Design a protein with these regions (language model features):
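Bacterial N-terminal signal peptides that target proteins for export
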Residues: 1-10
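Bacterial N-terminal signal peptides
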Residues: 10-19
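Bulky hydrophobic segments
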Residues: 23-184, 203-366
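Divalent metal-coordination and catalytic microenvironments
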Residues: 167, 191, 197
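Sec/Tat-exported extracytoplasmic proteins
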Residues: 172, 201-205, 386-393
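Long, internal stretches of domain cores in catalytic or enzyme-like folds
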Residues: 179, 194-200
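Hydrophobic/aromatic-rich structural module bridging two neighboring secondary-structure elements via a short loop
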Residues: 187-188
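Cellulosome-associated attachment modules in secreted, modular CAZymes
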Residues: 364-395
Length: 395
């Protein structure tokens, strides 16, 4: 059989399997008005039990809305199998998955080979797309069905990778608000898992044939939290309080995050959530692990993707120095190639600052993290430490 004929046959089988899986019913993407605008910003918070952290009613989180809505309830909840979850992060990543899916679907149907976008930072994301050899020979209905699935899978990967890049930037001092560095929130113990859940729920909502995107996210979020063993807001705060001076220090508005979650799925493809140890309300709970989004599903359908990040932020020089070889002058980050080295560098810096158990949720420190007053102070810690020192007693 000629090569072209084989390609058509393989693509045809892919499309047939998609139709069987979805029972010929398609989910609903964002409507044209929604798809015109990138997801709105939402204010997140740390998972600590300090004053400004929001703990909503875990069983009444309101209706999800891509646009502004007063019915949404955001903040930190606790689940027995998923640990603390930042609902704000989850909603943002669900929306970014939907937004990128809409844009990618359009680009694929137009045979675009270059796809670029920005998230909330200045960095530019670039995806070079190579199509199957028989792509243009498919009937339009089959092309659309395949493009929808490829767009959803690719959007999950891009959104999740973008959220990881945001955490990397904030670790190195990125100032999203333009004033104070966001270092304290970088890779805090609920971030990665919350982001991953958002991508998963967003993708599932886009495949829901019975509800529009917002209603689907509302229902899927409620179902996922219940499956993870969501707890009342009282337990969410108590769980955080139980790891004070262990996973974080501080009072009132001051907070210094010690426990960092650096598991983004690089080693085994799986993200394991951080569970609060010895929590009575969740005795014997087993963490619910989920696979990190990859390009495997896209590649299995005959597409090839080269994804790069072009950093524009001031912090880019620190990060690029990590990934450049002796003779390499790259100005772009390739996540598949470079994220491993960057995460290991961050882990080394975290261990130097907070001790060897910084990413081990079960190990307790030998001493109070606040007792080492002689430690070196980095610029990004100054605001937090100043508030902390003012609040602590003089003993």
């Amino acid at each position: 059989m000629p090569q072209k004929g084989k390609g058509i046959l393989i693509l045809g089988l892919c499309v047939l399997s998609l139709l069987v899986e979805t029972d010929s019913a398609q989910g609903r993407f964002l409507n044209p008005r929604q798809a015109q605008s990138a997801p709105r910003g939402r204010i997140a918070c740390l998972p600590s039990s300090t004053m400004v952290v929001r703990y909503p009613d875990s069983f009444a989180l309101g209706n999800h809305s891509y646009g502004f809505s007063i019915s949404e309830r955001n903040g930190i909840v606790y689940t027995c199998r998923g640990g603390h979850i930042d609902i704000t992060h989850l909603r943002k990543l669900a929306d970014w998955t939907a937004y990128l899916t809409s844009r990618l679907h359009e680009a694929l149907l137009l045979d675009h080979q270059e796809f670029s976008f920005r998230m909330r930072e200045a960095s530019l994301y670039h995806a070079h797309i190579e199509y199957p050899t028989s792509w243009r020979d498919l009937p339009s209905e089959d092309r659309d069905a395949l493009a929808r699935e490829v767009a959803i899978d690719l959007a999950q990967y891009l959104a999740y990778t973008g959220s990881t890049w945001h955490e990397i930037l904030t670790w190195f001092g990125y100032k999203g608000a333009g004033i104070w560095p966001e270092y304290q929130s970088a890779f805090s113990w609920e971030d990665n898992y919350s982001n991953l859940l958002g991508c998963r729920i967003g993708a599932a909502a886009l495949r829901d044939p019975d509800r529009d995107f917002e209603k689907a996210v509302t229902g899927l979020l409620d179902a996922e939290l219940r499956a993870l063993g969501v707890q009342p807001k009282r337990t969410a705060r108590q769980a955080a309080e139980s790891v004070r001076n262990w996973w974080f220090t501080g009072w009132l508005w001051s907070c210094r995050i010690v426990r960092r979650h650096l598991d983004i799925g690089l080693d085994d493809g799986i993200v394991t959530p951080c569970l609060i140890p010895d929590l009575a309300d969740c005795d014997g709970a087993i963490p619910q692990e989920y696979p990190a989004p990859t390009l495997s599903g896209v590649e299995q359908r005959g597409f090839s993707i080269c994804f790069e990040i072009e950093p524009k932020e001031w912090e880019r020089k620190k990060i690029l120095r990590i990934v450049r070889g002796d003779n390499e002058r790259t100005e772009r980050i390739e996540p598949a190639r470079h994220f491993g080295a960057i995460i290991e560098c961050i882990r080394g810096q975290a261990v130097a600052r907070y001790g060897p158990f910084v990413d081990d949720c079960c190990a307790k420190p030998a001493t109070d993290p606040r007792s080492d007053r002689s430690r070196s102070v980095n610029f990004e810690d100054i605001a937090t430490l100043a508030a902390q020192w003012l609040m602590e007693d003089s003993s």
